[in-house]
């Protein structure tokens, strides 16, 4: 005798309201939520010479650990898929006053001669772009780690998230504000410890 039971998909969060956003506007033309505040943590300026000189800054990710807010975001000189890319970090004790940005994952050189499967564009003096969707991890032992992803864009219509990037990286953020070394956590299929450069310990 065979017994079969009907499987049901897990119920997921879904929006049941009638108000829709207008995607032609960065704020969606939605009313602000009562009690929320918009805090500018840095101002980009191409005339600067430091970490704020690159004007494409996005994908902010926020963590709260050890009585401190940590804000990680990725940065490019002018556009999302225009190398080089880097990831920066800011900290705050109150959420209003923020430290100057520091580079936590620096620009990374793509090996010369690299070609993506099925493509013709070849890397020559090229740098990776950052393209992570997860910025922090807190371990069971209460340690904080920053994560990032080095993707590759070799042409105008290339995609850094096509599975042909270099790989995911990780480094520890210590309680005193210092950083541990950068390690590759996971390589994509074309890369390994033999054909990747050691990352700078900054």
PLM features: what roles do these ranges have?
Residues 1-10:
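Bacterial Sec-dependent N-terminal signal peptides
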Residues 86-94, 160-176:
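Beta-propeller blade signature
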Residues 99-106, 180-190:
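Beta-propeller fold detector
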Residues 68-72, 142-146:
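Entry beta-strands of beta-propeller and related beta-repeat scaffolds
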Residues 76-80, 151-156:
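Short glycine/acidic-enriched loop and turn motifs that connect beta-strands
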Residues 78-144:
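Blade-loop segments of beta-propeller domains
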Residues 200-202:
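Conserved small/polar residues in nucleotide/adenosyl-binding loops
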Residues 17-45, 72-106:
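Beta-propeller domains
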């Amino acid at each position: 005798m065979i017994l079969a039971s009907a499987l049901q998909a897990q119920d997921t969060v879904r929006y049941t309201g009638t108000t829709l956003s207008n995607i032609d506007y960065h704020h969606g033309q939605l009313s602000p939520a009562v009690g929320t505040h918009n805090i500018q943590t840095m101002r980009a300026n191409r005339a600067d010479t430091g970490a704020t000189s690159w004007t494409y800054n996005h994908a902010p990710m926020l963590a709260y650990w050890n009585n401190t807010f940590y804000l990680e975001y990725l940065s490019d000189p002018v556009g999302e898929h225009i190398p080089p890319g880097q990831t920066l970090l800011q900290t705050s004790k109150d959420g209003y006053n923020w430290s100057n940005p520091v580079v936590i994952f620096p620009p990374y050189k793509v090996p010369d001669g690299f070609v993506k499967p099925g493509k013709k564009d070849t890397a020559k003096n090229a740098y990776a772009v950052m393209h992570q969707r997860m910025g922090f991890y807190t371990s069971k032992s209460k340690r904080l780690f920053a994560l990032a992803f080095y993707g590759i864009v070799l042409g105008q219509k290339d995609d850094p998230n096509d599975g042909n990037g270099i790989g995911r990286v990780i480094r520890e953020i210590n309680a005193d504000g210092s950083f541990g070394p950068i390690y590759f956590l996971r390589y994509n299929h074309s890369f390994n410890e033999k054909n990747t450069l050691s990352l700078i310990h900054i």
